[in-house]
A protein has these predicted regions:
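Short, non-ligating residues that shape and space the ligands of small metal-coordination modules
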Residues: 36-37, 56-57
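Transmembrane alpha-helix entry/boundary detector in multi-pass membrane proteins
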Residues: 81-89, 117-139, 163, 167
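Juxtamembrane helix-capping/reentrant segments at transmembrane boundaries
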Residues: 158-173
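Cytosolic juxtamembrane amphipathic/interface segments immediately preceding
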Residues: 70-81
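Short cysteine-rich clusters marking metal-coordination/redox-active sites
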Residues: 27-30, 47-50
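Hydrophobic cores of alpha-helical transmembrane segments in multi-pass integral membrane proteins
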Residues: 88-103, 130-149, 170-184, 213-227
């Protein structure tokens, strides 16, 4: 099952990558997919993963990278917070999505399925736990974002790699989506503060619950893409 999830995540990430990167080629050393637009005016670039200096030439419409050397004096921070901090948002967020989805299902099926009575009783606790997970996930995402910017400034010397630009853009999107999801959930307008469930008799509550689920789903796509692209910057391909 985990393998299937990874395949789906990779397919989603590939779609965004190809639109964002444009034409690409692979580093001949670590096989990281690089964007041709990142090559400077002298046709040179440094691979962000392995540090080789590449001379990228166009041969019959194909990008051919040639290794010229290695960037020896690359900054190597002793404490890199970013790779460690990313695990908390990525690990907690799916459980928040699962909690909200379970609350919606229980809200709809609970009245007609007696077997869900125990979940109905625990719905307020589940709603609170979902909110806590959302706050922790999005809160730690702020730490992840700024530690990533620090890595970009120091380790990658602010070079405008397509991977970095995509990660910055998607990080901002995730923070916006996460903040919106927290606001919706904490307001009690979608999932009642008293019962933890959606008030099926209220059209507004139904619409807001659907909006929250949609926002959470979009956040899953964004954070999965961030994790996939970030992984390539650590391990290559």
């Amino acid at each position: 099952m985990i393998g299937d999830i990874r395949k789906v995540t990779a397919k989603i990430a590939e779609r965004f990558k190809h639109r964002f990167y444009g034409r690409t080629f692979q580093c001949p050393v670590c096989h990281l997919e690089l964007a041709l637009v990142d090559v400077n005016g002298n046709r040179l670039m440094v691979c962000p993963v392995c540090g080789v200096v590449l001379d990228v030439e166009e041969v019959y419409g194909h990008a051919v990278p040639v290794v010229l050397g290695v960037e020896v004096r690359r900054p190597q921070p002793k404490t890199r917070i970013h790779p460690l901090a990313t695990h908390l948002p990525i690990g907690l967020y799916p459980f928040a999505v699962l909690g909200a989805g379970l609350l919606l299902i229980v809200s709809i099926l609970g009245p007609v399925m007696p077997g869900l009575a125990p979940l109905l009783d625990r719905a307020p606790v589940l709603a609170d736990a979902t909110l806590v997970l959302l706050v922790l996930s999005v809160g730690f995402s702020v730490v992840t974002f700024f530690s990533g910017l620090r890595d970009w400034y120091r380790r990658y010397r602010r070079r405008p790699y397509a991977q970095i630009r995509l990660k910055i853009a998607f990080s901002v999107i995730f923070l916006v989506l996460g903040g919106l999801a927290i606001a919706l959930h904490a307001s009690g307008a979608a999932f009642s503060s008293a019962t933890g469930l959606v008030d099926l008799s209220s059209p507004l509550a139904l619409v807001l619950a659907a909006v929250e689920i949609a926002v959470l789903g979009a956040g899953m796509v964004v954070i999965a893409t961030l994790g996939h692209v970030g992984g390539t910057l650590v391990f290559g391909r």
